[in-house]
Amino acid sequence: QAGEVTGGQRAAATPPRRPALPIGDVDGERASSRSTGVGELDRVLGGGIVPGAVILLAGEPGVGKSTLLLDVAAKAARTAASSGRGPVLYVTGEESAAQVRGRAERIGALEPNLLIADETELGIVLGHVEASAPSLLIVDSVQTISSAQVEGGAGGVAQVRAVAASLIRVA
């Protein structure tokens, strides 16, 4: 039966704008992807990062997510510079810019087209995005960013949802 109970009221069914199609009839045009420079990650992502995509990388603490992201950021920055695209912006809410630079030195990831910002306020992060027009934005980690317009602390469900939604909109 159409509709579901939400807040004690039944939602009304709305006529679809276009009919549902058999999957084989859907245009198979594949969005172009950009290599991350890390072969195994490209394989997992189906060829690389699709422009406008939002990817959430999750894992246990200490498994190397931040190091992997920094490596990807440096390789993407190098590629972006050579192809005339904007810089890569790496926003860290977990470490200072100096700590990220230290790791970048250790893994050979110092690239002039790689910008680092250590911020935890969403408005400031969005200001960095607007000012730098990055070809790739990496946020490490979304749960450390908070919005002044949303109640609760960074990492809470409402904050993570609002921050993620804002970042998706700028993607």
Model-derived regions: residue spans:
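Detector for small/aliphatic-rich hydrophobic stretches
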Residues: 1-55, 67, 74-79, 83-90
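Conserved inter-motif catalytic segment of the P-loop NTP-binding fold
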Residues: 52, 60-63, 67-72, 76-169
